[in-house]
């Protein structure tokens, strides 16, 4: 309910409702000491997950090479998370959930920031030229 007007697909809706760090090791040390820090913490976590997304997509683009096609993107996507060390769990979740969209965006030449905005992990930066 409500998805029809939100512009979100069911997969985007589930990710939007899920905490960006659910079960991810690198986020476990981010628990706030006091409840008033929750808003700041959420912004910091979103910043961390956005930065992680950009790093993962950049690594994927580097592995795909200068002339990507569906096969090279799929092959690179199956290997990229093993190269991400601490971001491996987040990488696998992103690839499992959004590979089709990421692949399409890479094939159209989008940059990592734009791809992470498309999959709703990063917010669009406003006011920048």
From Swiss-Prot:
Q: Where is it made, tissue-wise?
A: Cytotoxic T and NK cells.
Keywords, A to Z, come to: Antibiotic, Antimicrobial, Disulfide bond, Fungicide, Secreted, Signal
Boundaries of every Saposin B-type domain copy: 46-126
The organism named in the record is: Sus scrofa (Pig)
Transmembrane stretches, start-end: none
Q: Where in the cell is it found?
A: Secreted
Q: Which PROSITE patterns match?
A: SAP_B (PS50015)
In this entry the propeptide is located at 7-46, 125-129
Q: Spell out the PANTHER family in the cross-references.
A: GRANULYSIN, GRANULYSIN RELATED
Report the InterPro entries cross-referenced here. Answer: Granulysin-like, SapB_1, SapB_2, Saposin-like, SaposinB_dom
One GO-annotated biological process of the protein: defense response to fungus
Q: Give the principal location in a single coarse category.
A: secreted
| Pfam families associated with the record | SapB_1, SapB_2
Q: Where is the signal peptide?
A: 1-6
Any S-S bridges, and between which cysteines? 50-122, 53-116, 81-91
Name the chain's protein.
Answer: Antimicrobial peptide NK-lysin
